[in-house]
Amino acid sequence: KSLPGNAEIYRPENVAPVENSPLSGMNLCFLGSSVTEGAASLETSFAEYIAVRNNCTYVKEAVGGTTLADNDKTSYIQRMLHNIDPNAQFDAFICQLSTNDASNAIPLGEISSSRNLEDFDTKTVLGALEYIIVYADTTWHCPVVFYTGTQYDSPAYGKMVEQLLKIENIAKINAFAEVFR
């Protein structure tokens, strides 16, 4: 709480909106773990800033310490299936590439050529990624965007980012990972 970046001046309600933002009026969905949650910033993350600065509405489904891989009821997949309204109208689905999968040594898996949900091995990182992409695309019919974490010195996470960029070309999604290369 006493971190300088958590000062009142930086709270979303104290940030000026962007005039004529192309995001104005959009409804965004954020799925992730601690970064999306805002764990070190009083539960306020970039999602709140994007919404306030750009006159957006949003849904934020974020729980710290969780994984993409479907290994328990708090996984990204389970929370996406059970906590996000499948009838919602989203303009974009934005998902965090979790470092927790790398930290927990979740198997990377293989990229599939399928677009059938039942074909993905969701116990692996890549199977979970592909499941999330296909489910979001077929449920909300909106662009699917992934973002990577800050610099994280992990060979396993580096491989996850590399594979995400391969999936990006196959699945026609957007991955914001180039910043850290």
Where are each of the predicted segments found?
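Membrane/wall-proximal cationic-aromatic binding patches
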Residues: L3-F30
